Swiss-Prot record:
This is DNA translocase FtsK. It comes from Listeria monocytogenes serovar 1/2a (strain ATCC BAA-679 / EGD-e). Residues 423-619 form the FtsK domain. InterPro entries: AAA+_ATPase, FtsK/SpoIIIE/SftA, FtsK_alpha, FtsK_dom, Ftsk_gamma, P-loop_NTPase, WH-like_DNA-bd_sf, WH_DNA-bd_sf. CDD domains: TrwB_TraG_TraD_VirD4. Belongs to the FtsK/SpoIIIE/SftA family. It comes from the Bacteria. ATP binds at G443, S444, G445, K446, S447, V448. SMART domains: AAA, Ftsk_gamma.
Amino acid sequence: MATQKKKTSGRKKSSTRSKKKQSASFRLEITGVILIAIGVIGLLQLGFVGRGFFALAEMFVGLLSYVLLAGSVILGGYMVIRRKMPHLFSKRLVGIYLIVLGFLTYIHMYFIIHNLGANASVVSSTWKLVLENLFRPNQVGFVGGGMIGAAITSITYFLLDRLGTNLIAVLLIIYGFSLVSGISIRQFFSKIAEFVRYLFTKGKVATEKGKEVKAKRDKKKAEKIVDVEPDEVIDVIEPLQEEKTPPIISNFSSKVEQEKAPVEEKISQKEQDLEMFQQESFENEIYQLPPVDILAPAKVTDQSKEYDQIKVNAKKLEDTFESFGVKAKITQVHLGPAVTKYEVQPSVGVKVSKIVSLSDDIALALAAKDIRIEAPIPGKSAIGIEVANQNVAMVSLREVLENNPKNNPDEKLQIALGRDISGEAMMANLDKMPHLLVAGATGSGKSVCINGIITSILLRAKPHEVKMMMIDPKMVELNVYNGIPHLLAPVVTNPKKAAQALQKVVAEMERRYDLFSHTGTRNMQGYNDYVKKHNELNEEKQPELPFIVVIVDELADLMMVASNDVEDAITRLAQMARAAGIHLIIATQRPSVDVITGVIKANIPSRIAFAVSSSIDSRTILDMGGAEKLLGRGDMLLLPVGSSKPTRIQGAFLSDAEVEDVVNYVISQQKAQYSEEMIPDDIPEVEGEVTDELYHEAVELVVEMQTASVSMLQRKFRIGYNRAARLIDEMEQRGVVGPHEGSKPRRVNVEVSPEHE
């Protein structure tokens, strides 16, 4: 009996053990299936749950969320197939962990430098972005290496700075590869050295084989020529030699130099006769361009409210269209820095004009201050409805320059403007524009735009490559640039001297065209190429021509003082200066036809319009409406040459402190060397008595009548036209009357005294 009881108790124990094993394996299978499901749903981002899993993975490992979810699938598969937990801290797995940690550290270091800024709090800034991404998946975007990357980087960056952090990341990756592959670090580097030697020897063998093949080909050609009969050799070779002689490079270049030698003598003689300004002849090799880091990084603006508003507005738009019987749907939405653009695709048979006519109703439905409708969007079968954001995201000049998709260092006149509605960095090449008109109401962002253009050029071009002439009648906007080596002359602030400065630029343009005609070149680029060839072959070096950018900050004031001289100079420069490498940037507050005349508009094809008060002003600038609906504070419409419709841009902001930093950096590199011939002459003061005995009587008459004209003096004093005109000119020089203003009467600057009355 005792033996039977022992047997039954042993069976019970074995059965309970097997049951425990079965339940444990069952739990492992369930866990494995759950891990596989989480990984697959997260990787494919299936629905709200999938996006949530993916965002949760991004929260921990950022850009490597795919690796984490793939690891979840692999771990789950192992648990289902093997029905046991893997050893999570084996040698190879530890190596994989180290590789992942190294990549997370490197990725988050890159994220800090390019997105958060070097001075940002790493953990707190990342935590904010991660939380926002968790609750709004696929809307925040790149979050670096997640919280794990942020935790490691915050420690290493504090202790070892940027270079040390990157070094730690590389060492972690190398050691991880060593653990995974089972190769020691010494063997790892020796393998790399062997591979480099192998590539070097392969390349050497390939070049030797190439030489052998070429030698065999030459030998075959020589054999073919020998096989030909002697009579044919003489007949064929002589013409061949005659034909092949000219294309030889050495003979051709020497022939060119022989032909152009007398021309150079003429040029040097002509240059002695011309009054040319003494520019910097050659490159200053010590000069270094200012780094982009000198500008302040962009501040991150929270636009989370805008995402919520987009869905609400899209629904309101579709309901509004439906209530007016218009069949249309919202196909795409672009959230920009200051404006959100809704792309509306109308159904077949719906007129575009019908949607445009609903602009007031759409503004009412969206409770928007104002909306702008782009109908249709160029290159798309859709209509754009632009609605202002609740919070405007600031666009800094630094972020536009850093995210430039077409960054070419050779383009010295590439300027940064801002970001368009889709968030793309907007750049423009001034040499292709080739002249630019900037207009808008006061406080709309013109001066910041001009400062951004000048700073963009200073960051790209050295003083011998680009020169500038600045005219600032307001005396406060451009004075900060006095002393930079790029200036041809100090900033011109006297409106009367401004016309003279423009005339000197016209004279420089004519001098350049004279040089082109004597060298047989067509433009500045061709002339500079010619000078480079000349300098390579001659000891006497000739200077290359720099670009010249003429910046006029307030055209309206100049047109009031000397409209005829200013308009003539601007017209001549706009018509002819492009090939000479001279480009105009003209800014004005008052976009009226008296200031922006038809002749000026016809010759300045590229325009930038800031916010204006009426559609008439918008038509004066752009020849179309739209600028009256802009928001101000840098909101602009760019109409480049060759474009039929303008592009809406949020202008890049540049503070006064940033401008001063760039100017101080440039001046520290090189001092200004002004050209005496380009500095406007001092306006001589009128001295001495007037010889005409009628002058004082004429002044009394003009002051009494409070009007001045040549015909009035002719009638009152019974004198000829020439004498009356001289009297008026004398009064203008002495400040009694103002300048000639077209059909308007001259302004009398002296009031009638009470005693005279």
